[in-house]
From Swiss-Prot:
Expressed by the venom gland. One of its GO terms (cellular component) is extracellular region. This is Beta-theraphotoxin-Hlv1a. Negative results: has no effect on human and rat Nav1.8/SCN10A. Has no effect on voltage-gated potassium channel human Kv11.1/KCNH2/ERG at 10 uM. The keyword Disulfide bond applies. It comes from Cyriopagopus lividus (Cobalt blue tarantula). Disulfide bonds join C2-C17, C9-C24, C16-C31.
Length: 35
């Protein structure tokens, strides 16, 4: 399963939910909206 908004993530292995336009923040290491 992909990671939801605000969940901890790894920028080098981004598992945030792309269908929700989420990307892993390089700075904060959590999933945020990428727009």
């Amino acid at each position: 399963a992909c990671l939801g908004f605000g969940e901890k993530c790894n920028p080098s292995n981004d598992k945030c939910c792309k269908s929700s336009s989420l990307v892993c923040s390089q700075k904060h290491k959590w999933c945020k909206y990428g727009w």
